[in-house]
Amino acid sequence: MLLATTVLLLAITSAQTAADPKSDVYAGPIAKALEKAGPNRAEIESFLARADGTGDAQKRDAARWLVANMDGHGFAVIELTTTDGTRLEFDALNYKSLTEAKAAFDAIEAKNPGCDFRKIRFDSDLEHASADFLFAHLDEAFGTWRTMPWAKPIRYEVFRDFILPYRGSNEPLGLWRTPARTRLAEICRENEGETDVRAFGEKVRANVHPWTGFTDLFYMHPTDQSYAEMCERKLGRCEDITNMISFGMRSVGAICASDYTPWWAASDNNHAWEVVLDANGQGHAGLAGRAAKVYRKTFAHQPDSLAAMKREEETVPKWLSSSHYVDVTAQYQTTSDPTITLARAPEGQRFAYIAVFNSGSWKPIDWANITQGQAKFHAIGRNICYLPMIHVGEADEPAGAPFVIDLDGIVHTLAAAAGTSDSTSLIASTTKPDITDPDTGALRARTIVKPDAAFELFLWKDGAWKSIGRIERGETAHAFESLPSDGLYWLVEDGSEKLERIFTIVAGKQVFW
């Protein structure tokens, strides 16, 4: 009789909590999640019921937290398509090297101008995750957290954010906790007396890192790999490696965050890396390049994100469209909070962006509200060149002159407005400086002006690159005169991939950004 009464009271309490949003912050998001689950709703409800049936208040809360924040998570299939979405036959893994894969890609692109890697399918977790899958992850995560000696100091909220999540990015779903923990059984036995979770985490990180090696071939395989796929292929890109390390660490109750910069500020591409955290969920790694912004992935929705702020009809740049990240730039470096006056702020435009120059174009990397024609950005990196932008439809458009924030936080506007009395000259010798590859640590030697190639010099003026001179094939004179001293320049080889770096001119010499 006592048992029956207890069960009834629990059921009534659960029902009252679910019915009263004031007593349960998850009630509203869970209701929306269940609607979006569609035919899979019964599986999500079954998962919640099983967690509730354990009688474990923390497991119940954790299950509700997962479902409340599940919207937006899923497996993304990204493939090469034409501009109208027609799939093109291309798999980088069919080639031995990035060079071979790029040659094949270039041949396809020649026949299909504008083709690119695009998301062709998204299997949302709400619509595809089973109750068995979710409960297995929940149960194993709690078992690890509650039994491993180094995990005892970890608060519940930190456990929930960094150990409980069952996925790393947009990879296929997988039950990776048991196999990863099995592979780490020896290091766990060797550290049974360890109580410092960060110290143990560093050991696990070092142990797991070799499980997946880096190869640039995966730059052209943008679909994230599952744990099983990485175990089979043993290769991936930085995102894959970070996910593998996070899987390994979570499986044994160590804490790992996944940080990333969407676009490097002084080189091409982007980067993701793992960060070993302490029991309070704090920590950061070193930077492998110049970063304007560093973000940390989260499973939870962030109410202050651009995705949460924008209206349904508003479009935003791709890399800022997620609500599952927080800004941790200030944990890595000294930052600035500049207020930028926009040269262009159309009526009704609520957000402005700043962009960095990467892979031949300006890439938005941060956002701010527009107030009376101005935008104040927060915690952006120094020693970097930026361009203010707005997003119109699906296009990113310039909204002001580029500017540099120097190491002291001083803003230098590059309006190319200096007159002849304040002009400068340039003897062009280099199109790209020495750059250390963030993924491999290898030094990429500078690219010089070659006598057997032709080059064009561009100046950023009035919102676009303007051609202001050329170096023809075989010319020995590489001098340009009467250039604006406050200009931003770009020297591009004819027929190149446009990977040359932008620069300013100081005392007649190129300063690259």
Predicted regions and their residues:
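Short amphipathic beta-strand segments in non-cytosolic proteins
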Residues: 350-368, 454-468
